[in-house]
Amino acid sequence: MSRYRGPRVKIIRRLGALPGLTTKTLKSKSGYINQSTSNKKVSQYRIRLEEKQKLRFHYGLTERQLLKYVRIARKAKGSTGQVLLQLLEMRLDNILFRLGMALTVPGARQLVNHRHILINNSMVDIPSYNCKPKDVITIKDRPKSQSIITKNLNSFQKSKVPNHLSFDLMQVKGLVNQMIDREWILLKINELLVVEYYSRQV
């Protein structure tokens, strides 16, 4: 299954807020009833499916990519769900998003693909690059790179930077301090339901 490129509002209308996918939010209407779920019981399969879809759309993954991460998480020590979230949060495209260098994960992916980003002074053009503690993230010293990221930073609230990261606005430099803790995950998600969804596929 390919990466979703359709209307993003359609997705958040069905799944709720997905800050990694879009900055748009839906205003709730008083008295509004979701006709697709009213007057009928929602199956456990559908509940698990929607949690999985939240994860996939928020982090901008294909179905194959997400399944690969689930398999890696199952082989690692610790809670499969929490390891899965850590793997996704430490992707370079997501780190750029959490630092405010991009307003969405798709926007961050473009920055990486267009070679605007340096890790420890080396150019990295792989959005799925696994960032590690002590990694230093900077941008190429060229006007176009500076302009794009400065514009994004001006729209970002510095208070949103999670504890496992730090950002120097003057130097436009990010630092990975440590692996992310569960409490700093931005997406509202029940990762256990995602693991259960994939239980027969891994």
Swiss-Prot record:
InterPro entries hit by this protein: Ribosomal_uS4, Ribosomal_uS4_bac-type, Ribosomal_uS4_CS, Ribosomal_uS4_N, S4_RNA-bd, S4_RNA-bd_sf
- Which Gene Ontology BP terms does the record give? ribosomal small subunit biogenesis; translation
SUPFAM superfamilies per the record? Alpha-L RNA-binding motif (SSF55174)
Q: What is its main location?
A: plastid
Report the GO terms under cellular component.
chloroplast; small ribosomal subunit
Q: Can the keyword Ribonucleoprotein be found in this entry's annotation?
A: yes
Q: Which GO terms describe its molecular function?
A: rRNA binding; structural constituent of ribosome
Keywords, A to Z? Chloroplast, Plastid, Ribonucleoprotein, Ribosomal protein, RNA-binding, rRNA-binding
Q: Where does this one sit in the cell?
A: Plastid, Chloroplast
UniProt domain S4 RNA-binding: residue ranges: 90-154
> Which Gene3D superfamilies did the record assign?
Ribosomal Protein S4 Delta 41, Chain A, domain 1, RNA-binding S4 domain
Q: Pfam families of this UniProt entry?
A: Ribosomal_S4, S4
For this chain, the family text in UniProt reads: Belongs to the universal ribosomal protein uS4 family.
Q: How does it assemble?
A: Part of the 30S ribosomal subunit. Contacts protein S5. The interaction surface between S4 and S5 is involved in control of translational fidelity.
Q: What does this protein do?
A: One of the primary rRNA binding proteins, it binds directly to 16S rRNA where it nucleates assembly of the body of the 30S subunit.
Q: What is this protein called?
A: Small ribosomal subunit protein uS4c
Organism equals Monoclea forsteri
User: Which gene is annotated as encoding this protein in its UniProt record?
Assistant: rps4
